[in-house]
Amino acid sequence: MIELRAFRQACHAVARSAGGSVIEFRLATGVTPNFHQGVITYGDRHVAVVLSRDTAMLAVSEPRTPTSPDEVHESGPLTFVDAPELVAALAEHSGFSVLTAADLDGPFDAGAWPEIDRADINYWKPRTLGEALFNYWD
């Protein structure tokens, strides 16, 4: 189980280090999505720090807000963004691993990620690492 308190603390610390603030936390409570979001504003940007509910993996993406229950299932993959200053600040928080947009937009190698359910891989057929780690699969 991922400690949500540590995630919240990391988001606040990273936002402060960038001269910004946390707008809100969007915590997943149902089957989907398989990630939580900490939405941060800094400068003229809004981004989401996303935390996989199954692993201690963090990434930075465009914030995602489904507007209806149907959209959750049709929302597609996250759009990961380059934010080197945030990635560097996130990497300082022990207990989490941080992946960059380049990592997540790269091809998915199932052999390198044995903790991801093989049935899900076979059914959903993720093309990128980001699709495999951060998704709306049920």
Which residues fall in each region the model found?
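Acidic, proline/glycine-rich low-complexity IDRs
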Residues: 97-138
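Intrinsically disordered, low-complexity regulatory segments
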Residues: 1-111
